[in-house]
Regions:
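Well-ordered beta-strand positions
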Residues: 5, 52, 94-95
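Short internal beta-strands
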Residues: 4-12
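Gly/Ser/Thr-rich loops at beta-strand to alpha-helix junctions
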Residues: 11-14, 103-105
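Conserved beta-strand segments of the P-loop GTPase G domain that flank and frequently precede/overlap
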Residues: 8-9, 55-57, 99-100
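Structured adenosyl-cofactor binding patch, chiefly the S-adenosyl-L-methionine
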Residues: 90-128, 132-138
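S-adenosyl-L-methionine/SAH cofactor-binding core of RNA-modifying enzymes
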Residues: 17-85
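Long, charged alpha-helical interface segments
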Residues: 138-154
């Protein structure tokens, strides 16, 4: 469900990459992250390898009507950027998709797009290797710490 790899392009930020590693170690799953200094070079190489490029922008086509036409049998790179996205991205992208035509949160746009692409959100999905497991509860927090459970059973 969702993304399996994150590429931070442009300025290197070890804090962002470290946070992604920490979240994966805590909540499980198979997720990797890397930095790439040249976004256009990365995307050109990705496209040459047969990947599809989806650019989330407020200037693109409506995401609800366009997303179902995106093939999911090949890798997909989702470009999420702010005001400084180079104009060439619009030409490189196989799809320029708008989650609304007003300024919006890039994180929210990514979440909505992935939900539409993947056919909804799996609310109770548990990732393998999780240290913490969050259980749904109507009036509070229920978190199981699998490390504490294994420590107390010894």
């Amino acid at each position: 469900m969702g993304a399996s790899h994150f590429v931070l392009c442009g300025d290197d930020d070890d804090k962002v990459l470290g946070t992604l590693v920490d979240v994966t170690e805590t909540f499980g799953g198979h997720f990797t992250a890397e930095h790439h200094g040249k976004p256009l070079g990365y995307l050109r190489h990705f496209a040459k390898q047969g990947g599809q490029i989806v650019h989330l922008t407020m200037y693109g086509e409506d995401f609800e009507s366009t997303t179902p036409s995106i093939p999911t049998d090949a890798p997909i790179a989702v470009v999420v950027g702010g005001a400084k996205v180079p104009g060439e991205i619009y030409k490189l992208a196989n799809y320029n998709i708008a989650v609304g035509h007003q300024p919006h949160s890039e994180v929210a746009a990514l979440a909505l797009f992935l939900s539409e692409l993947m056919g909804g959100v799996a609310g109770s999905e548990q990732f393998p290797g999780a240290r913490l497991e969050v259980k749904p509860h109507p009036s509070g927090k229920v978190v199981i710490d699998h490390e504490e459970d294994s420590d107390t059973s010894q």
